Amino acid sequence: MALTKERKNEIIEAYATKQGDTGSPEVQVAVLTEQITTLNDHLRTHKKDHHSRRGLLKMVGRRRNLLTYLRNKDVSRYRSLIERLGLRR
Protein backbone atom coordinates (compact mmCIF):
# COMPACT_ATOMS: atom_id res chain seq x y z
CA MET A 1 0.00 0.00 0.00
CA ALA A 2 1.24 3.48 -0.80
CA LEU A 3 2.21 6.01 1.83
CA THR A 4 -0.87 7.96 2.96
CA LYS A 5 -0.89 11.72 3.46
CA GLU A 6 -1.53 11.30 7.18
CA ARG A 7 1.41 8.92 7.66
CA LYS A 8 3.69 11.15 5.59
CA ASN A 9 2.71 14.19 7.68
CA GLU A 10 3.43 12.23 10.89
CA ILE A 11 6.91 11.39 9.61
CA ILE A 12 7.54 14.99 8.56
CA GLU A 13 6.50 16.29 11.99
CA ALA A 14 8.68 13.73 13.76
CA TYR A 15 11.86 14.48 11.80
CA ALA A 16 11.44 18.19 10.96
CA THR A 17 14.12 20.51 12.30
CA LYS A 18 11.73 23.48 12.37
CA GLN A 19 8.09 24.29 11.61
CA GLY A 20 7.17 23.66 7.98
CA ASP A 21 10.40 21.79 7.24
CA THR A 22 9.87 19.27 4.45
CA GLY A 23 13.15 19.49 2.56
CA SER A 24 15.83 18.80 5.14
CA PRO A 25 17.86 15.63 4.54
CA GLU A 26 16.49 14.09 7.75
CA VAL A 27 12.88 14.43 6.59
CA GLN A 28 13.64 13.23 3.07
CA VAL A 29 15.53 10.18 4.33
CA ALA A 30 12.77 9.32 6.82
CA VAL A 31 10.05 9.51 4.15
CA LEU A 32 12.14 7.47 1.71
CA THR A 33 12.80 4.87 4.40
CA GLU A 34 9.07 4.47 5.01
CA GLN A 35 8.41 4.15 1.27
CA ILE A 36 11.23 1.62 0.91
CA THR A 37 9.84 -0.47 3.77
CA THR A 38 6.35 -0.45 2.25
CA LEU A 39 7.63 -1.35 -1.20
CA ASN A 40 9.85 -4.07 0.25
CA ASP A 41 6.80 -5.72 1.82
CA HIS A 42 4.98 -5.49 -1.52
CA LEU A 43 7.86 -7.15 -3.34
CA ARG A 44 7.94 -10.04 -0.87
CA THR A 45 4.48 -11.08 -2.04
CA HIS A 46 4.83 -10.00 -5.71
CA LYS A 47 8.23 -11.37 -6.62
CA LYS A 48 7.91 -10.74 -10.38
CA ASP A 49 6.98 -7.06 -10.12
CA HIS A 50 10.14 -5.79 -11.78
CA HIS A 51 8.83 -2.27 -12.39
CA SER A 52 8.36 -1.73 -8.67
CA ARG A 53 11.76 -3.31 -8.00
CA ARG A 54 13.36 -0.70 -10.26
CA GLY A 55 11.57 2.06 -8.34
CA LEU A 56 12.80 0.54 -5.09
CA LEU A 57 16.39 0.58 -6.31
CA LYS A 58 16.04 4.23 -7.35
CA MET A 59 14.69 5.13 -3.90
CA VAL A 60 17.53 3.27 -2.17
CA GLY A 61 20.06 5.14 -4.32
CA ARG A 62 18.45 8.49 -3.57
CA ARG A 63 18.45 7.72 0.16
CA ARG A 64 22.10 6.67 -0.01
CA ASN A 65 23.04 9.96 -1.71
CA LEU A 66 21.15 11.99 0.91
CA LEU A 67 22.82 10.07 3.74
CA THR A 68 26.25 10.63 2.19
CA TYR A 69 25.50 14.35 1.90
CA LEU A 70 24.38 14.52 5.53
CA ARG A 71 27.43 12.54 6.71
CA ASN A 72 29.76 14.96 4.92
CA LYS A 73 27.88 18.03 6.16
CA ASP A 74 27.21 17.14 9.83
CA VAL A 75 28.30 13.81 11.31
CA SER A 76 26.33 14.18 14.55
CA ARG A 77 23.03 14.73 12.69
CA TYR A 78 23.89 11.75 10.46
CA ARG A 79 24.56 9.44 13.42
CA SER A 80 21.41 10.47 15.28
CA LEU A 81 19.29 9.93 12.15
CA ILE A 82 20.80 6.49 11.54
CA GLU A 83 20.08 5.55 15.14
CA ARG A 84 16.49 6.87 15.05
CA LEU A 85 15.67 5.05 11.81
CA GLY A 86 17.44 1.83 12.78
CA LEU A 87 19.64 1.74 9.68
CA ARG A 88 23.12 0.21 9.50
CA ARG A 89 22.94 -2.18 12.41
UniProtKB/Swiss-Prot annotation:
One of the primary rRNA binding proteins, it binds directly to 16S rRNA where it helps nucleate assembly of the platform of the 30S subunit by binding and bridging several RNA helices of the 16S rRNA. The keyword Membrane does not apply. The lineage of its organism: Bacteria, Bacillati, Bacillota, Bacilli, Bacillales. One of its GO terms (molecular function) is structural constituent of ribosome. GO terms for cellular component: cytosolic small ribosomal subunit. Part of the 30S ribosomal subunit. Forms a bridge to the 50S subunit in the 70S ribosome, contacting the 23S rRNA. Belongs to the universal ribosomal protein uS15 family. This is Small ribosomal subunit protein uS15. GO terms for biological process: translation. It holds the Pfam family Ribosomal_S15. It comes from Exiguobacterium sibiricum (strain DSM 17290 / CCUG 55495 / CIP 109462 / JCM 13490 / 255-15). Keywords: Ribonucleoprotein, Ribosomal protein, RNA-binding, rRNA-binding.
